[in-house]
Amino acid sequence: MAYSACFLHQSALASSAARSSSSSSSQRHVSLSKPVQIICKAQQSHEDDNSAVSRRLALTLLVGAAAVGSKVSPADAAYGEAANVFGKPKTNTDFLPYNGDGFKVQVPAKWNPSKEIEYPGQVLRFEDNFDATSNLNVMVTPTDKKSITDYGSPEEFLSQVNYLLGKQAYFGETASEGGFDNNAVATANILESSSQEVGGKPYYYLSVLTRTADGDEGGKHQLITATVNGGKLYICKAQAGDKRWFKGARKFVESAATSFSVA
């Protein structure tokens, strides 16, 4: 009777490594978790009729052992190898979803909720753990408008809610200070404005840089998202000081403001 045996040795042949290094760069290689040498021996009995069967059995075991010992790289999945297509997708840990009354927004994960009330109709406020100048606010107020476009252009809308841009620390007449006009202690420059339809509703987006003569971090970058739904004006405002804006806060402010939507 014929039989075969296969043995796995955890050592690589020098000749095998040499052949692998000399093969064409266009060929696909299967990397091994450990160097594996596979040796199969087939014993032939006196029965000649069973010799072919023994050789086939040995080859089958050889292929099976090679498949078990190999480690498929992720790139091999493109060529038909098994892929972890049912694996859990990666989640963005930089933000946490917040579902409010009639709205939802992505909040930076390292920002804390705050009880400070700064604006009329404020229902939500989060602040940066290290700098309260970086914060997120959501305001909901009644309106007789049917759509955000009833306020006019994005710039005209901003002029009607300019209280969102903050208050200066000095009131009264001044000579020109820090490049400001006479009697002016604050400026607001609209860097960008746009209108976009989401879920069948128009939204206004504005990016504003405000500066005050009393010098607050050189200015604040304020991003505003606004829409109207069900007789209510929804406004989301996220901001960061100019210094932190360029040190990484920008992505958190922009992502939070643009994630805002109403139900």
Swiss-Prot record:
InterPro entries associated with the record: Mog1/PsbP_a/b/a-sand (IPR016123), PsbP_C (IPR002683)
GO molecular function, one term: salicylic acid binding
GO cellular component: apoplast; chloroplast; chloroplast envelope; chloroplast stroma; chloroplast thylakoid; chloroplast thylakoid lumen; chloroplast thylakoid membrane; extracellular region
PTM annotation (Phosphoserine): residues: 153
Compartments where found: Plastid, Chloroplast thylakoid lumen
Biological processes annotated in GO: photosynthesis, light reaction
UniProtKB keywords: Chloroplast, Phosphoprotein, Photosynthesis, Photosystem II, Plastid, Thylakoid, Transit peptide
Family: Belongs to the PsbP family.
Subunit and partners: Interacts with WAK1.
Record function comment: May be involved in the regulation of photosystem II.
Protein name: Oxygen-evolving enhancer protein 2-1, chloroplastic
Source organism: Arabidopsis thaliana
Gene: PSBP1
